[in-house]
Amino acid sequence: TVLTVPNDDKDLWPTLGPQVCEFIEAYLIFGPGDLRGMPARLDQEKRAFIYRMYEVFPQDHPQAGRRRFKRVGLSLAKGQAKTELAAWIAAAELHQEGPVRCIGWRNGAPLGGPVTDPYIPIVSYTEQQTEELCYGTLYTVIHEGPLDRDFDAGLTKSGRRDGDGRAVPLAAAPSARDGSLTTFQVA
């Protein structure tokens, strides 16, 4: 695997980042810990990461509206709420109104819409890590927050109440699951 750091562009790319950040701060909460149940708040570093993560090709490009990056990685020091951030992004990707895909343009800016039938494996080295860390945080964020009515959240999977889309904790590579079309992954 080759990791490439994108160049600092002089021109800003269109991004769904502002819409994703607004969704997170309007509807999601902190998971287990001192801030449990408090409204989600993004610092400037996490906001910049989300803006970059959700950059799309411009309207006049042959791939207009498609994500600029297929994969993104984030490395932060311990205690920087990485698990919370992953759970918040997974919740936005899972929600039936999450503005995570470009569905059109308004005044040259991308409009965000949901994934039709998301499949989100939440992968860790061990099953215990998966359940106690990110999936456990995702469960808390959606089960104890304002979006609880939109999800059927359980200890083994969380999905939309309408039946389309789910997030599942896994302790192995998602590619080993035949027939599963991964739309977003937390590892």
For each feature predicted by the language model, list its residue ranges:
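Phosphate/NTP-binding elements of NTP-utilizing enzymes
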Residues: T1-A187
